[in-house]
Amino acid sequence: YRYQSPSFSFESNVYYMKYKDQLILTGKISEIGEMLTKNIPDSYRMGLELASAIRFNPLLRWDGNLTLSRNKIKNFTEEDIDVYDTNDKWLESRSTYLGTTDIAYSPNIVANSLLTFTYNRFEAVLHGHYVSRQYIDNTSCNDRSIDPYFVNNLRLAYTFALPHTKSVTAGLDINNLFNVEYETNGYNSHTYYVGDKRVNEKRYFPQAGTNILANLTVNF
């Protein structure tokens, strides 16, 4: 569905994708750091995508988009997890049937908001980005997941002219404006049992705190 007027626009889309033998990430990595994948017999992805824009006046505009989704594996079995005794002696490989679980690295909610202020040659853009919880394996366990995060970035730009140029734009990007502590990725380096106690050696990729980048663009 799509609607557009001079000051407002709206789009929506619904999707459903059913997979046979979908190749998905397992949350593990190889000895050289590559993300490992495997085929899943029965899975699906479905969701709703929304996008909108509002021009409040000649100076102020808002753009936003939102994706709501379900990303599921049916009849999932976690296979071949090593089991050791308390003396580090290997006992067996254990498999556990978990039923319907979430596909790894597939958040259910992703949203973006851009508020743009423009005055003559000056522009300021506030970008908000939200990602809901996502799992670093296919077991839907919160202990092996990336926490939801909401991050804001601010971009400032001023365009002017210099001799022998079409335009010059000086910009300033303030990333992670509110200094949020968050991670965007992770993996299980090793998962095993000691008796009945599960051990997950998890690794995460923390992102930078508030940082500022200056840039200059010259068009001839």
Descriptions of predicted regions:
Residues 7-10, 58-62, 121-125, 162-168:
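Repeated loop/turn-to-beta-strand initiation elements of outer-membrane beta-barrel proteins
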Residues 1-3, 48-54, 64, 113-117, ...:
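Residues on the lipid-exposed face of transmembrane beta-strands in outer-membrane beta-barrel proteins
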Residues 26-36, 69, 75-90, 131-132, ...:
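Flexible, surface-exposed loop regions and adjacent strand-edge segments
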Residues 23-25, 37, 50, 79, ...:
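Extracellular/periplasmic, surface-exposed regions of secreted and cell-surface proteins
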Residues 1-39, 44-46:
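Membrane-embedded beta-barrel scaffold of Gram-negative outer-membrane proteins
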Residues 4-6, 42-46, 107-111, 148-152, ...:
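Residues that define the transmembrane beta-barrel architecture of outer-membrane proteins
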Residues 15-19, 38-138:
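Gram-negative outer-membrane beta-barrel transporters
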Residues 130-136, 158-220:
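C-terminal beta-signal and adjacent terminal beta-strands/loops
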